[in-house]
UniProtKB/Swiss-Prot annotation:
Gene3D superfamilies listed in its UniProt record: Nucleoprotein (1.10.3610.10), Rhabdovirus nucleocapsid protein like domain (1.10.3570.10)
Homology family: Belongs to the lyssavirus nucleocapsid protein family.
GO CC list: helical viral capsid; host cell cytoplasm; ribonucleoprotein complex; viral nucleocapsid
Function: Encapsidates the genome, protecting it from nucleases. If expressed without protein P it binds non-specifically RNA and therefore can bind it's own mRNA. Interaction with protein P abolishes any non-specific RNA binding, and prevents phosphorylation. The soluble N-P complex encapsidates specifically the genomic RNA, with protein N protecting the genome like a pearl necklace. The encapsidated genomic RNA is termed the nucleocapsid (NC) and serves as template for viral transcription and replication. Protein N binds protein P in the NC through a different interaction, and can be phosphorylated.
Record lineage: Viruses, Riboviria, Orthornavirae, Negarnaviricota, Haploviricotina
Phosphoserine, modified sites: 389
UniProt GO MF annotations: RNA binding
Record text on subunit structure and interactions: Homomultimerizes to form the nucleocapsid. Binds to viral genomic RNA.
Name of this chain's protein: Nucleoprotein
SUPFAM superfamilies linked to this entry: Rhabdovirus nucleoprotein-like
Gene: N
InterPro entries: Rhabdo_ncapsid, Rhabdovirus_ncapsid_C, Rhabdovirus_ncapsid_N, Rhabdovirus_nucleoprotein-like
Keywords assigned by UniProt, alphabetized: Capsid protein, Helical capsid protein, Host cytoplasm, Phosphoprotein, Ribonucleoprotein, RNA-binding, Superantigen, Viral nucleoprotein, Virion
UniProt-annotated location(s): Virion; Host cytoplasm
Protein species of origin: European bat lyssavirus 1 (strain Bat/Germany/RV9/1968)
Length: 451
């Protein structure tokens, strides 16, 4: 018998099939570097920096930039930003630099060059006969990297916001230690011609390398980071939200997880804390894993850990936090159940769950719980089984324990209390809800609740 086959009838005809499904569509890639080789890219021939500067600057003024030339120039210009490594720098077993070493952004990565010449079509700027100064190079590098940040701003009605951000960044690169090299609004005009450049792997890679360098090295031109800072923890919104959440509620990650009372958290918690990653290591390649090409499908994004993401932002909504009210709900990750969990969580100022305990301190606690469940003995009801949880204030340490919180939810039938709903409605009443946001979900779901 083939254990992989299933047999059935279709119109009285016996059919035998071996069900096979797409697998790689769902596979997340962890960023850990196992071969101890630095992240790398391949670019064209190393350009003459004077020629490249003139070509790129004239292209910027004409709002016509070649991404290959821009990447080649950005990589070549890395030698201009030398700094001193403050401590021994190691990540994933790779020795990046020793304390006191002179390093540049190029030290962090491997950049391979071919013999392919760039276009370097000097359509303008021929009046620049002298060599560009380092401040001029720094200004051009900074403006080019700002294109990355601008291309990451997406969504409706972002026109004015994007223009304001572009103007502020432009101002940075026309004041000391930088120098003005383009006219006002040039950056925004250029961006419109390069609106999707954040999707270009080599450009994203170089932005990440510059950011990783300036994030650690004290440097005269560290303000270049204004355009690259969005590469830090990119596609990591799920893990970043969880980190901010446990800081807000003043619990350790281990303590907070004990309040995640829903089965669907299991896979996500396992995914977020995969062994061998450097999630807690400062200045690790992990921080820039997306831009450096170490992961195609992030296991730490909001979609990868959607239940955790939904829960945390429902708690934020309960607290009236604008960021949470504006965040986009992951519709496929039980938003109704997560809103119940978030209501209790918010009331207690930390974790609350829905329907069942799923995480335990150790194996014995898990076994004790399963034994109690199997015999239908709900031992957790013993301490406050007579409490009317809608009228009682719970602020003692005992009532904030995972056992007490879980009991309270079960006593209310896994539903929000009237006080939770009133709180949700009140904190979002004066907020202009964005489409598909948590605020819109709460308005639609609870504003007309008869309770």
């Amino acid at each position: 018998m083939d254990v992989n086959k299933v047999v059935f009838k279709v119109h009285n005809q016996l059919v035998s099939v071996r069900p096979e499904v797409i697998s790689d569509q769902y596979e997340y890639k962890y960023p850990a570097i196992k071969d101890k080789k630095k992240p790398s890219i391949t670019l064209g021939k190393d350009p003459d920096l004077k020629t490249a500067y003139k070509s790129i600057l004239s292209g910027m003024n004409a709002a016509k930039l070649d991404p290959d030339d821009v990447c080649s120039y950005l990589a070549g210009a890395m030698v201009l930003f030398e700094g001193i490594c403050p401590e021994d720098w190691t990540s994933y077993g790779i020795n990046i630099a020793k304390k006191g070493d002179k390093i540049t952004p190029a030290t962090l990565v491997d950049i391979h060059r071919t013999n392919t010449e760039g276009n370097w079509a000097q359509t303008g700027g021929q009046d620049l006969t002298r060599d560009p100064t380092t401040p001029e190079h720094a200004s051009l590098v900074g403006l080019l990297l700002c294109l990355y940040r601008l291309s990451k701003i997406v969504g409706q009605n972002t026109g004015n916001y994007k223009t304001n951000v572009a103007d502020r960044m432009e101002q940075i690169f026309e004041t000391a230690p930088f120098v003005k090299i383009v006219e006002h609004h040039t950056l925004m005009t250029t961006h419109k011609m390069c609106a999707n450049w954040s999707t270009i792997p080599n450009f994203r890679f170089l932005a990440g390398a510059y950011d990783m360098f300036f994030a650690r090295i004290e440097h005269l031109y560290s303000a270049i980071r204004v355009g690259t800072v969005v590469t830090a923890y990119e596609d990591c919104s799920g893990l970043v939200s969880f980190t901010g959440f446990i800081k807000q509620i003043n619990l350790t990650a281990r303590e907070a997880i004990l309040y995640f009372f829903h089965k669907n958290f299991e896979e996500e918690i396992k995914r977020m804390f995969e062994p061998g990653q450097e999630t807690a290591v400062p200045h690790s390649y992990f921080i820039h894993f997306r831009s450096l090409g170490l992961s195609g499908k992030s296991p730490y994004s909001s979609n990868a850990v959607g239940h955790v993401f939904n829960l945390i932002h429902f708690v934020g909504c309960y607290m009236g936090q604008i960021r949470s009210l504006n965040a986009t709900v992951i519709q496929s990750c039980a938003p109704h159940e997560m809103s119940v969990l978030g209501g209790y969580l918010g009331e207690e100022f930390f974790g609350k769950g829905t329907f069942e305990r799923r995480f335990f301190r150790d194996e014995k606690e898990l076994q004790d719980y399963e034994a109690a469940e199997s015999t239908k003995v709900d031992v957790a009801l013993a301490d406050d089984g007579t409490v009317n949880s809608d009228d009682e204030d719970f602020f003692s340490g005992d009532t904030r324990s995972p056992e007490a919180v879980y009991t309270r939810i079960m006593m209310n039938g896994g539903r929000l209390k009237r006080s939770h709903i009133k709180r949700y409605v009140s904190v979002s009443a004066n907020h202009q809800a964005r489409p598909n946001s948590f605020a819109e979900f709460l308005n639609k779901t609870y504003s007309s609740d008869p309770r």
